[in-house]
Regions:
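Class I S-adenosyl-L-methionine-dependent methyltransferase catalytic core
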Residues: 1-144
Length: 144
């Protein structure tokens, strides 16, 4: 038998309406009780957990009026995510200067499309959790 790893999924956004829509989508996907949603600013993001993953699709700043705000957000993301340096970060954006604004070159960058918008998927790999290897070794040993 396969032992399930605990899964802790959280969704954050500063906008209350966006959180409501995300919650509705989770319920429709039958994941309503699996994901914890919370309205909060990016600057409040923190965790006591040693390892984790952040996956985000921030605003792209496609409209000229939003560009400066988005660039400010990307700089803040770099500072906030930098405090979680043992975590992996995955960011989807169309902004060509994202790495410069974020303050770090991605471990890997993939070109994708989000609808008809050409985007880049920036992957920043954190260290692998040491206990993961032990968990899988124990599972392999049990199954033999």
């Amino acid at each position: 038998t396969r032992k399930e790893c605990p899964l802790d999924i959280m969704g954050y956004d500063i906008d209350k309406k966006t959180i409501g829509l995300a919650r509705e989508n989770a319920v429709q996907a039958k994941l309503g009780n699996t994901i914890h949603f919370q309205q909060q600013p990016l600057s409040s993001l923190s965790s006591r957990k040693m390892y984790g993953k952040i996956i985000c699709n921030p605003p792209y700043g496609e409209r000229l009026s939003d560009k400066k705000e988005v660039e400010k957000l990307y700089k803040e993301m770099g500072k906030v995510f930098g405090k979680l340096d043992s975590w992996s970060h995955y960011i989807l954006t169309s902004h060509s200067d994202f790495e410069k604004l974020f303050g770090k070159k991605a471990s890997k960058k993939r070109k994708l499309y989000n609808g008809n918008i050409k985007v880049d998927y920036y992957q920043y790999y954190g260290p692998r959790p040491k206990h993961t290897h032990k968990f899988f070794h124990e599972e392999l040993t049990k199954s033999r």
